[in-house]
A protein has these predicted regions:
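Extended active-site neighborhood of metal-dependent phosphoesterases/phosphodiesterases
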Residues: 52-103
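N-terminal active-site segment of His-dependent metallophosphoesterases
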Residues: 1-56, 60, 100-102
Length: 103
């Protein structure tokens, strides 16, 4: 089994610093012959607070024609308790509804 691992893409419709990295990466992944892609977190810039960031990112991820698992990172669902964006049930529920299960 061939697995491609990607991480920390930090995509956003409103803060597009890294969005230009996507198309070359998606083209490479689709041509890689991989059986599975695992994105290991920080899919979005501010997915912890912005539905539109996660929705935008999932539109990009759908361009990959290989099965993909996405692990949420701190930019996706929040960070430590006491931080400005702590992980909580609301953020995790939103992630699951917009992205899918967390692994």
């Amino acid at each position: 089994m061939k697995i491609v691992q990607i991480t920390d893409t930090h995509f956003s419709p409103s803060i597009p610093h890294f969005n230009g990295n996507w198309q070359p990466l998606a083209d490479w992944v689709n041509g890689s012959g991989a059986d599975l892609v695992i994105h290991t977190g920080d899919l979005a810039v501010d997915g912890a607070d912005k539905d539109e960031d996660l929705t935008f990112c999932m539109g990009l991820m759908q361009q990959v024609k290989i099965p993909m698992l996405i692990v949420p990172g701190n930019h996706d669902v929040g960070h430590l308790p006491g931080s400005l964006q702590p992980v909580d049930a609301t953020r995790l529920s939103r992630w699951r509804s917009l992205v899918g299960p967390d692994y």
